[in-house]
Amino acid sequence: MRTYRTLAPWAALFRSGNSVTAIFGVVLGSILASQGLPSGDFAIITVLHCLSVMTFMFSWNALNDYMDIEIDRINRPDRPLPSGEISEVAARRGILSTAILSASFLIVAAYISHSGEIGLEGWLPSLAIWMIALVLLFNYESSSKLSFRMKDSGLPGNLAISMSVGLVIIFGAASVSDPLNQRVWSVFIVGFLYNFSRE
């Protein structure tokens, strides 16, 4: 019971359900691109990509709640941060730790690619996609002068969220070195439009 009380607020902060669901997007992208279950180094890299996406989303979701804490004190006082179940200091550590984990899984995937038959060049699109997602995160959440502040700008913010959701399947295809696969891009477009219509 005590363990549940400790973990439940973190699961809520990280939106663990949505974040874990993203794993299926990565797996789907890799299966569509390779026309079957990936094997060998590709299978290992796909798993690492899944973990990278999951922890990236943990970080983004936690950052979103951290940035909205004052609003949530009024509108959603039951959430982990405004309720005090998780302190702001602990939340910052969680955001940083999960971001580092996401990058670490990516680095391990790069090492496996470089050390094996795939080669680093075949894996580099994965890094580009991860960086695009990071740029979207910065421009969505940050209030910096360098940011487009898309979160509060309506349509651009919706585009950023829909793009980040769609990128998951492209990231999966990149895990098997085929990020330009036509089947994957068809699913990406459908997913992007569906999510955009919901936003």
Q: Residue ranges of each PLM-predicted region?
A:
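Short helix-coil transition/hinge motifs at the ends and kinks of transmembrane helices
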Residues: 36-41, 110-124, 143-151, 177-183
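Interhelical loop and helix-boundary elements at the membrane-water interface
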Residues: 1-23, 76-96, 139-164
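Alpha-helical membrane-embedding segments
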Residues: 82-83, 104-117, 163-169, 185-195
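Hydrophobic alpha-helical transmembrane segments in multi-pass integral membrane proteins
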Residues: 166-178
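Membrane-embedded alpha-helical segments that form the functional core of polytopic membrane enzymes
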Residues: 23-67, 102, 107, 123-138, ...
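Membrane-water interface of alpha-helical transmembrane segments
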Residues: 5, 9-12, 43, 88-92, ...
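Juxtamembrane/interfacial segments around transmembrane helices
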Residues: 99-109, 153-162, 176-187
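Multi-pass membrane catalytic core of lipid/isoprenoid biosynthesis enzymes
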Residues: 69, 73-130
